[in-house]
A protein has these predicted regions:
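Active-site neighborhoods and metal-handling regions in enzymes and metal-associated proteins
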Residues: 1-165
Length: 165
């Protein structure tokens, strides 16, 4: 998605042309030997506005906070709260719009879910995504998504592409 369509978390493509200055949200993955991958990155075709940079930095801060704390044994609900609480404290809680992440494996979306409703613990050696986002209707949206291997004492980020602007 690009331009104002980035404010729609799962936008279906249409015939809208890309314009100079549009931001681009790329949610991508592939399958390898039957297993899925998933990541999201933002591309700015011009220098971001102050508001775009503020939102980007906030989403990245939330994601990094979640990644720092996620480990085996915590619930999906608690994992979601690690990212969501930062966005809520900044006043954008209602603009989050989806779960904080999901399990991934043979299917692109599997259990566990990083969501308010998921009260089971994350299991060691499972793969999840952490994907906070803020979506400002009619303007733009920002989402950053990485895949993590859950370990006993933390996690290992499997996404090797930078999330720097």
């Amino acid at each position: 998605a690009f331009g104002k369509h980035t404010a729609i978390p799962h936008h279906n493509s249409d015939n809208t042309p890309l314009r100079n200055g549009d931001i681009i949200l790329i949610d991508m993955g592939m399958k390898y030997k039957g297993y899925c991958s998933d990541m999201t990155r933002m591309i700015f075709t011009k220098n971001p506005t102050e508001k775009q940079k503020e939102i980007y930095d906030l989403v990245l801060k939330a994601q990094k906070a979640g990644i720092k704390k996620i480990r085996a044994g915590i619930t999906g609900k608690k994992a979601d709260k690690f990212t969501r609480s930062i966005i809520e404290k900044a006043g954008y809680g209602e603009k989050y719009g989806h779960a904080g992440g999901h399990g991934i494996g043979l299917d692109i979306h599997e259990q566990p879910s990083l969501a308010e409703t998921y009260k089971k613990p994350l299991k060691e050696n499972s793969i999840i995504t952490v994907e906070p986002g803020i979506y400002l209707e009619g303007e733009f949206g920002i989402r950053i998504e990485d895949m993590l291997l859950i370990t006993k004492n933390g996690n290992r980020n499997l996404t090797k592409i930078t999330s720097d602007l």
